[in-house]
């Protein structure tokens, strides 16, 4: 069996590494570089990848594709894709399934299909170095990638001829690269990963015990649409706006000129990491009736920092949230690891240092650490790397919709994966023969405010009073973060399950919106949850009281029966409203009105010659509402 290679499939650059003895080694590509631009160009005769594709981008802008990772697993209508459409020189189009694809020379190409070209280049680079075929890989993704994006990455690997043995989060991979072989007994590190198109922050605990190293992710967060490309776009906009002021020409309408500006902006941004100012000089950038136009603009580091300070600030806000989720203070962080090329920017380093009160480590290569960590994980899976245990987490809570439109969480966010969690639910109606399991992801109490991942029916439930059937719902998340959900009737043994498909994954805007909404609406969520609990309690008491009236029969006099039924009607009317105090008051009124019913029941029981046995409580059964959804076939 061959080696399992580690691939950092980046937005701007990609990198491949492999275990060489007891250490991971980054492999140089055919051009002699340790990283490869994640750029793909389609010409009349061939497909170019990496530096050759980048070199011809100016003359072939519409067919030269870059930053495809920003489209992978995304819907065409999403805010991020619509924003990218305005600035990308190539054509982003809507696929039949609603995903964002790319139109090249009249052909619609899926992002996994395009990304596969980069993976093929990484595969070939490794094969040339090893002198043997490579069929297995560990591929990294941003920690905040959702199910759709993870599955799309696995698909890209499959298209490239690779069996993806594991999807690993980029900050976790960087931690592996940093901590492998460390002799420190216990340390907590923060991995700040600002790459070409994505941002992640993870708090990771590294333990050494009895010769075994454990890497445990305590919490993770980020933004899958924030990275160096966004920094570049700020510089591009500035250059274009300045040129328009001077010359009255908008270069956004000229794809070839726009590509030249893009390359110059990226170069200027990089130069300003070591210089205080740089000159952007693009002769013959365009022409009009008066003749050729030349672009010459001086950009200072101070100007660059002013253009992007809000982007850096948003990343610092994520740091605060993730530290809180991890239950750690700034003082408890032993080391800060910076990953991703954009972390070379002095402003980024300064703001991170200010937040943590200490400088980040300088001995970790931000371009190579992720690929090295992926190779280490490949070595772990292969058995070449011993005594290393990696414990990653799921970034968002998972659950199902239950009675009253509440999301009942089975797996909390930042739960270690792989994981499996089961909980028993029941029916909402008497003699209900089917239930629909509605799978949700998010942080809100109100089911409709979360993302629907899918739903499925469990049919053939034996007729029984409501609350009697026991439906066991199980969530199973594998080590790649891919979700399976099953439901089983414990009485009949009948089972149904669903694998959450890529087409129903979350977009990162929805993830971030869920978290923001959860924080902004925490009080509203609490009140809603209390209202639903009051409604559910009212419904249960009304249902039980009606049954007791039937059982009491003639033992209950007509006046008392009328009063109780009126109290039930009042309670049911109140339960349809949004006034919790009113529901509570009507619940108490029904309990008081039902006192004669209890006396009648006791009298009837004594006449029957013994006490009525108490109903057995359904311990561990959650009162849940399932509705049967009929398929229109």
Curated annotation (Swiss-Prot):
Entry keyword NAD: no
Family: Belongs to the heat shock protein 70 family.
Keywords: ATP-binding, Chaperone, Nucleotide-binding, Phosphoprotein, Stress response
Single GO MF annotation: ATP-dependent protein folding chaperone
Gene giving rise to this polypeptide: dnaK
Keyword ATP-binding belongs to the record: yes
Organism: Actinobacillus pleuropneumoniae serotype 3 (strain JL03)
Xref: InterPro entries: ATPase_NBD (IPR043129), Chaperone_DnaK (IPR012725), Heat_shock_70_CS (IPR018181), HSP70_C_sf (IPR029048), HSP70_peptide-bd_sf (IPR029047), Hsp_70_fam (IPR013126)
Residue numbers carrying Phosphothreonine: 198
Protein name: Chaperone protein DnaK
